[in-house]
Amino acid sequence: MVREEVRVCTRTLQWKCVESRADNKRLYYGRFILSPLMKGQADTIGIAMRRALLGEIEGTCITCAKSEKIPHEYSNIVGIEESVHEILMNLKEIVLRSNLYGTRDASICVRGPRHVTAQDIISPPSVEIIDTTQHIASLTEPIDLCIGLQIERNRGYNMKTPKNSQDGRYPIDAVFMPVRNANHSIHSYGNGNEKQEILFLEIWTNGSLTPKEALHEASRNLIDLFIPFLHANEENFILKDNQNKVALPLFTFHDRLAKQRKNKKEISFQCIFIDQSELPPRTYNCLKRSNIHTLLDLLNNSQEDLMKIEHFRIEDVKQILGILQKHFAIDLPKNKF
């Protein structure tokens, strides 16, 4: 067990990588410990670190494909085994590593018959293809396949609106998340007032960076977020008579949403982000992919709207309703309003 292998220091806070492996080119795993921590500190650090790992680290993706010979996304091309949609989905799965800023152009230009893989992508020097064996398409006849690509570096999700492009450009939904998953667990030891904790942090990445690199980048991002609070020369603002404070009243969404908007109290809901709630990761990710980031965004949707979200289930809607009732005494209408 890790407890037997780790020598816990009672004075200096230390971290250590206790397990690291590469399951394949697109799946890395790392397990880390941080100790000794006072009671409650491990959970505080673990929650913040997990959110930073999943939401604050930048990744590189293919965000657009262009070919003037393609009539629409769901068409089939003679001599190519896959449909255009399947090719776009394969391009979405390509794992890239880069230090670029903004967007860069890349391309694929091959002649069949042959298998087209990520190795056939002609990319800028600043972009590295992690797994060159990733499949893109199968050309069954002696035809030319030329596709222009757009590569971006960003964070989170970038959901494209599906449409038939007139200039042959086809946006690709991008998931700029090099960390596939992150978990934390806590081991307590000691008795009474001497009780301390060890934080275990597990990280899975897509191979574009190692779990150790992800841990370092997430830590830097958290530090950058807290640095403004350390500025000693900031003015002290004193609020008198509750000026500029907005209370969250108990109300029913159906009856008083219009009144809340007239009074401009929706600003309070704009300041409450959905990652502050108790939503499970799958539900949270579905909402983020639909550009629902704040409580106000959520309240602008009905239960019917939520059920239209891809991979959303009735159980997810019930869980959201329970959280809204528990913390805000708010309801969502069943149908559009």
From Swiss-Prot:
It is an enzyme of class 2 (transferase). Residues 1-232 are annotated as: Alpha N-terminal domain (alpha-NTD). One of its GO terms (biological process) is DNA-templated transcription. It catalyses: RNA(n) + a ribonucleoside 5'-triphosphate = RNA(n+1) + diphosphate. Gene3D superfamilies: 5' to 3' exonuclease, C-terminal subdomain, DNA-directed RNA polymerase, insert domain, RNA polymerase, RBP11-like subunit. Keywords: Chloroplast, DNA-directed RNA polymerase, Nucleotidyltransferase, Plastid, Transcription, Transferase. SMART domains: RPOLD. It is found in: Plastid, Chloroplast. Its EC number is 2.7.7.6. Disulfide bonds: none annotated. One of its GO terms (cellular component) is mitochondrion. One of its GO terms (molecular function) is protein dimerization activity. It comes from the Eukaryota. It holds the Pfam family RNA_pol_A_CTD. Residues 266-337 are annotated as: Alpha C-terminal domain (alpha-CTD). The N-terminal domain is essential for RNAP assembly and basal transcription, whereas the C-terminal domain is involved in interaction with transcriptional regulators and with upstream promoter elements. Belongs to the RNA polymerase alpha chain family. In plastids the minimal PEP RNA polymerase catalytic core is composed of four subunits: alpha, beta, beta', and beta''. When a (nuclear-encoded) sigma factor is associated with the core the holoenzyme is formed, which can initiate transcription. DNA-dependent RNA polymerase catalyzes the transcription of DNA into RNA using the four ribonucleoside triphosphates as substrates. This is DNA-directed RNA polymerase subunit alpha. The gene is rpoA.
